[in-house]
Amino acid sequence: MAAKIYHLDVVSAEKQMFSGLVEKIQVTGSEGELGIFPGHAPLLTAIKPGMVRIVKEHGNEEYIYLSGGVLEVQPSTVTVLADTAIRGEDLDEARAMESKRKAEEHINNSHGDIDYAQASAELSKALAKLRVIELTKKAM
């Protein structure tokens, strides 16, 4: 019988955010949404700004915002190396809303492809933070 759990480490440049046994995770890779279950094939991929949804050993869920990074899947261990990682409960909703508003304003007033691309990336990050906040509130 295959294992129903595996070890997950979520690490940012500042600190280790999570280390423990999990049933599965969900993360946004460079090619789209990924669900990583026990026994997943080895994989190395870039992570887009978004969240990692962690389903812990006994079914409890945790959400962590990621600004991007790398996902490595090995037979019994999964590692998320994030540029920036923030727990859902540590995100500031008012700041995320203000970032969203500013990014939308920059998109509407952009002059050139570079301005638009930068504002679009900032909007994606703000929306991801707001989604993590929303899911964290539901899980509590």
Swiss-Prot record:
The gene is atpC. GO terms for cellular component: plasma membrane; proton-transporting ATP synthase complex. The lineage of its organism: Bacteria, Pseudomonadati, Pseudomonadota, Gammaproteobacteria, Enterobacterales. The keyword Secreted does not apply. NCBIfam families: ATP_synt_epsi (TIGR01216), PRK00571.1-4 (NF001847). F-type ATPases have 2 components, CF(1) - the catalytic core - and CF(0) - the membrane proton channel. CF(1) has five subunits: alpha(3), beta(3), gamma(1), delta(1), epsilon(1). CF(0) has three main subunits: a, b and c. Produces ATP from ADP in the presence of a proton gradient across the membrane. GO terms for molecular function: ATP binding; proton-transporting ATP synthase activity, rotational mechanism. Keywords: ATP synthesis, Cell inner membrane, Cell membrane, CF(1), Hydrogen ion transport, Ion transport, Membrane, Transport. It comes from Sodalis glossinidius (strain morsitans). It is found in: Cell inner membrane. It is a peripheral membrane protein. Belongs to the ATPase epsilon chain family. This is ATP synthase epsilon chain. Coiled coil: none annotated. InterPro entries: ATP_F1_dsu/esu_C_sf, ATP_synth_F1_dsu/esu, ATP_synth_F1_dsu/esu_N, ATP_synth_F1_esu_C, ATPsynth_dsu/esu_N.
